[in-house]
Amino acid sequence: SEGVNAWLKLCTTSSRIHHHCSVSTNTFRAAHRKPNLAQVPADEEFRKLFTATPGMVMCGADLSGIELRMLAHYLARYDGGRYADILLNGDIHQVNADKIGISRRDVKTVTYAFLYGAGDVKIGLSVDKQLSTDKARARGKQVRAAFIEAIDGLSELLQAVKKRSASGTILAIDGRKIFVESQHKALNYLLQCSAGVIAKRWLHITHENLPPTAHQLAFVHDELQYECKEEDVEDLKFLLELSAAQAGEYYSLRIPIAAEAKSGATWAEVH
């Protein structure tokens, strides 16, 4: 409440916060500031402060597991769609946990750490926070190797991305060039950029088909928030879910893209 980006200090006379959204990051993923709405805690006491205009209803949606779906898309070339099938019809984290020999909770943490380019130390600590740095590095290296072995086609995908990134760039889902700082970040950049491209296409398709009373409130990474009159709520929710699927189809993804839309009076009720 006292910092430069304190919400009340950034609140306008219209009782709104107009945050800044940039798409100029290295991975073309959206970045948020003044304030960073992506860092608003998920707790109800914080999210309920963000409300719909009186007489309007908030409608919002998140892309469902977009990072894992992008991984499934790129793996399909090497695993024949196995990862995508388990992701959609089974429990991918439990399958990997059984293969690696760690808990489902730990393998889920390891999965996202791996996808976001974490080093061996961080991966080791994600399994056991009590480890020393050296032991965490050794444990992380072991878990990383087991994780790669557990997922059919992942080793081949990593090698292909590493080879392509040797030139300094890789291509995103829409063909744009992504400049890669180092080869070990290449897969992370590929998945993050392609997920961002899907999110923006989702936003575009939704915007082109909005119900008469609807207008946008926020775009935060893989989340869209709108408000509309009560009579347009169901149409808007349907549109958000349909547009997500169409965004994936637009780029001929090897796995369907999905979103779950909710409505309510505050951000706490729709996210």
Regions found by a protein language model. Name each.
Residues 1-101, 160-223, 237-246:
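Acidic, glycine-rich two-metal-ion catalytic cores of nucleic acid-processing enzymes
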Residues 60-63, 111, 120-123, 215-229, ...:
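Catalytic palm active-site di-aspartate
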Residues 121-131, 224-240:
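Catalytic palm subdomain of template-directed nucleic-acid polymerases
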Residues 127-142:
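Short, basic interhelical loop/turn and adjoining N-cap
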Residues 120, 136, 140, 154, ...:
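Generic alpha-helical secondary structure
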Residues 71, 107-115, 147, 191, ...:
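Short alpha-helical scaffolding segments that buttress acidic/His motifs in well-ordered protein cores
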